[in-house]
């Protein structure tokens, strides 16, 4: 303390003192006052606060019991002796420290030094490594966009594209987001230089700048996507780009980010796990000393979304005596504990990168996984502070497609990638209409297979709808059957018109024409609000957010009143306005953005095309990319056989670790599928590699002992 007192500081060292009313407060305060005088420190009046109101003392004891893994009755000295550790009023603090006015003044002085502080003062700066020499971030981005536009449209750039890029670049410049786009572009360039398949998705697909830079594969102009769904001046938060990489090569990208920016400047953000009804009941029940069978029954009753009854009502329905004091207190405290933070975990892929040291901004810890560091803030904290986040995600289908392309390059000398696949292949769409989609991305589930023959996709946009329509949102909003009836010509497509004084009669057709008058996407919900109810783009985005945050019922109600009033004012019928809102509300939390569905539709088409034209390569790539998808290896093999592919058994003389292709005129496409040793149940890769490295493997003859050992793995093994 004396050494600290000798340093030049805005405030001298402080000794925090509290009056918890434990009987020895006076002696403790005298001791601290003497210590402060002897060291040149100041006494600081505090209250060692743990909860905001006295009634939270019981919950504080329960949390202590949960942390210490004991019951409340066994807490001993770890229990709160009284309820004094709460936020007290200035009058209460003045009474407690009446003999130490300097301690009260010290608290006021500390408050004065922090009075002007705001979280807005935590300034975030984008990385500057991505800038081109001699150029600002905006100039660097403009140069890269111009180069990419010239490469994509070498003859003439469409006017609509030019206008969209100008609009986006203006907004990017105003908001200072150019370094963000440059950083993401650098990540994409690194991955492609390494031959790693990648594709941006989510709201980033609403951006033409992202499209021309190759970050996303969706043309927003073609799909009439709103840029404000991605970047909005009113939101005051940075853009958020999700990028899918091959799931078994994502680690290369993650380690590249660490190497390029340093572990003191790059980390994966945390995700906050909160108490839900079941976990709250279990933890509080244990702390309160309830038996395991009682807590299990209560937890089961409280399980599931959309619970409307209180825990006490649920317990009563289960036959419990809710007048029992211990049970009643348990249920009350479990209600209080819900939505409390329980623990942090590592986000699936949200990477934070800064110009300065991230460790000076927040706590960065070592993750459980090797070579990973975690920022102890979640995505909501990061959004609130305007910090750049890039989601580096893994997608199994990208690994599968890359393996398929590599196999075709090796065996058929075809140089295929996601950009040069033949488009609008009638045979591919015909295969999908038959629901022949085992292994095909996003449309291989039973629900999707049932929908394919009903929707009958014939063009790319049909795949966009296919991806989006089999979701809880469209189903809850009663949009699926009207869309299918209209698509099949069983129901007339109608577009109600506003009062002629307020707009053209076809304004709803412009929004819903491609989906036959039925809103299927979040972007359509936003456009409906703008066109039919007079919302601004920023208000429409707030509506989308209110829908997504379904717990904030007050916000939803206000938006409903505004939307219904806006539509009726412009001449639409009241029942239509309420029906439109009900549809928007139905898929607000579970519906797909059109940009996201379009990004996934590209992979649907690519995987379907590969399956239709090169079934052996597709099946081989699927097997080598496991685990992924819905189907086990045996089902993938059976499907390959049904498509005329010859499937050859595992053979120690012919098989590698991965499955492979062999020339076979009798097989579809002239290629047979040779199963790999990885499919032998229980066979470790290191053991298989030792077998493969054995000399003269081609002339290997298995002994009875070897047969017994290998047969124990449960696989199909053939020997010469």
Name what the model sees in each region.
Residues 11, 39, 111-114, 261, ...:
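A structural signal for short coil/turn segments at secondary-structure junctions
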Residues 43-45, 123, 141, 542:
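Conserved acidic, metal-coordinating active-site core of Asp-based
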Residues 51, 83-84, 131-720:
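Noncatalytic, beta-rich nucleic-acid-contacting surfaces in large DNA/RNA-processing enzymes
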Residues 15-18, 42-46, 118-121, 200, ...:
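A structural signal for short, well-ordered beta-strand segments and their strand-loop junctions
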Residues 1-60, 95-98, 143, 147-150, ...:
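Domain-core and long-helix interface of multi-subunit machines
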Residues 58-140, 694, 704, 713, ...:
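Active-site or pore-adjacent capping/gating segments
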Residues 49-71, 237, 241-243, 622:
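Short alpha-helix plus adjacent loop in nuclease-associated cores
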Residues 12-15, 117, 265, 294:
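Short, structured loop/turn "capping" segments at alpha-beta junctions
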């Amino acid at each position: 303390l004396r050494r600290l007192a000798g340093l030049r500081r805005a405030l001298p060292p402080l000794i925090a003192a509290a009056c918890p009313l434990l009987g020895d407060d006076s002696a403790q305060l005298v001791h601290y006052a003497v210590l402060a005088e002897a060291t040149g420190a100041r006494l600081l009046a505090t209250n060692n606060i743990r909860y905001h109101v006295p009634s939270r003392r019981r919950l504080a004891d329960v949390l202590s019991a949960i942390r210490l893994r004991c019951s409340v009755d066994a807490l001993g000295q770890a229990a709160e002796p009284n309820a004094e550790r709460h936020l007290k009023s200035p009058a209460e603090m003045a009474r407690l420290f009446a003999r130490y006015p300097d301690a009260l003044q010290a608290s006021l002085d500390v408050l004065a030094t922090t009075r002007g502080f705001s979280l807005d003062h935590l300034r975030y700066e984008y990385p500057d490594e991505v800038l081109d020499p001699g150029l600002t971030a905006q100039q660097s981005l403009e140069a890269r966009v111009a180069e990419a536009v010239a490469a994509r449209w070498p003859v003439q750039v469409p006017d609509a594209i030019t206008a969209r890029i100008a609009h986006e670049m203006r907004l990017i410049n105003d908001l200072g987001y150019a370094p963000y786009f440059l950083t993401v572009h650098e990540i994409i360039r690194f991955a492609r230089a390494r031959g790693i398949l990648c594709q941006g998705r989510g709201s980033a697909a609403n951006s033409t700048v992202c499209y021309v830079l190759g970050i996303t594969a969706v043309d927003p102009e073609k799909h009439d996507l709103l840029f404000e769904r991605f970047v909005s001046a009113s939101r005051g938060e940075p853009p958020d780009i999700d990028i899918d990489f091959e799931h078994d090569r994502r680690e290369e990208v993650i380690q590249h980010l660490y190497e390029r920016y340093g572990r003191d400047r790059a980390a994966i953000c945390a995700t906050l796990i909160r108490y839900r009804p079941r976990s709250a009941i279990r933890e509080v029940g244990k702390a309160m000393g309830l038996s395991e069978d009682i807590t299990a029954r209560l937890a089961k009753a409280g399980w599931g979304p959309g619970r409307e009854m209180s825990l006490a009502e649920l317990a009563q329905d289960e036959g419990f005596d809710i007048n029992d004091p211990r049970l009643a207190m348990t249920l009350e405290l479990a209600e209080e504990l819900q939505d409390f933070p329980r623990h942090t975990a590592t986000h699936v892929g949200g990477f934070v990168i800064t110009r300065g040291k991230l460790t000076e901004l927040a706590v960065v810890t070592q993750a459980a996984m090797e070579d990973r560091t975690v920022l102890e803030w979640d995505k909501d904290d990061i959004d609130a502070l305007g910090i750049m986040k890039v989601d580096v995600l893994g997608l199994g289908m990208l690994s599968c497609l890359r393996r398929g392309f590599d196999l075709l390059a090796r065996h058929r000398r075809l140089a295929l990638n996601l950009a040069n696949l033949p488009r609008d292949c009638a045979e591919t769409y015909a295969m999908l209409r038959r629901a022949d989609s085992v292994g095909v991305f996003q449309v291989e589930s039973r629900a999707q297979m049932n929908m394919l023959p009903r929707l009958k996709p014939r063009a790319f946009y049909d795949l966009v709808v296919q991806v989006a329509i089999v979701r809880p949102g469209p189903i809850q909003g009663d949009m699926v059957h009207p869309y299918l009836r209209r698509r099949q010509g069983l129901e007339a497509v109608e577009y109600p018109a506003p009062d002629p004084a307020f707009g053209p009669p076809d304004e709803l057709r412009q929004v819903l024409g491609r989906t036959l008058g039925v809103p299927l996407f979040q972007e359509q919900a936003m456009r409906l609000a703008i066109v039919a109810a007079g919302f601004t783009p920023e208000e429409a985005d707030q509506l989308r957010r209110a829908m997504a945050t379904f717990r904030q019922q007050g916000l939803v109600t206000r938006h409903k009143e505004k939307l219904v009033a806006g539509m009726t004012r412009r001449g639409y019928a009241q029942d239509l306005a309420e029906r439109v809102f009900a549809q928007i509300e139905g898929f607000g939390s579970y519906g797909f953005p059109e940009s996201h569905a379009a990004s996934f539709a590209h992979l649907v088409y690519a995987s379907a095309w590969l399956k239709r034209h090169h079934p052996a390569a597709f099946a081989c790539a699927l097997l080598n990319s496991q685990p992924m998808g819905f189907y086990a290896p045996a089902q993938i093999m059976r499907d390959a056989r049904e498509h005329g592919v010859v499937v050859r058994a595992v053979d120690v003389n012919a098989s590698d670790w991965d499955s492979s292709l062999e020339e076979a005129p009798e097989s579809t496409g002239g290629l047979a599928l040779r199963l790999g040793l990885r499919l032998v149940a229980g066979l470790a890769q290191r053991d298989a590699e030792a077998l493969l490295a054995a000399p003269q493997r081609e002339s290997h003859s298995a002994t009875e002992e070897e047969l017994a050992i290998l047969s124990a793995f449960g696989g199909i093994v053939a020997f010469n």
